[in-house]
């Protein structure tokens, strides 16, 4: 049966877990709409790469 030969110390465990972290989403300023939006995604107003490709939400 597979059992660890030694107890994993808190330091060893925490050093391994230092790589588990959140990264901030990439955000860019869209000059067409004047809003900030995430890269490689359609903005809330329906623009992608400066071109209108989708209808905006009806709530606006």
Curated annotation (Swiss-Prot):
Signal peptide: none annotated. One of its GO terms (molecular function) is structural constituent of ribosome. One of its GO terms (biological process) is translation. One of its GO terms (cellular component) is large ribosomal subunit. Keywords: Ribonucleoprotein, Ribosomal protein. InterPro entries: Ribosomal_bL32, Ribosomal_bL32_bact, Ribosomal_zn-bd. PANTHER family: 50S RIBOSOMAL PROTEIN L32 (PTHR35534), LARGE RIBOSOMAL SUBUNIT PROTEIN BL32 (PTHR35534:SF1). Belongs to the bacterial ribosomal protein bL32 family. This is Large ribosomal subunit protein bL32. The gene is rpmF.
């Amino acid at each position: 049966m597979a059992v660890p030969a030694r107890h994993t110390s808190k330091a060893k465990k925490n050093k391994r877990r230092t790589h588990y972290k959140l990264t901030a989403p990439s955000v860019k300023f869209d000059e067409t709409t004047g809003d900030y939006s995430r890269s490689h995604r359609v903005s809330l107003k329906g623009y992608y790469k400066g071109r209108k490709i989708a209808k905006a939400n009806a709530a606006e």
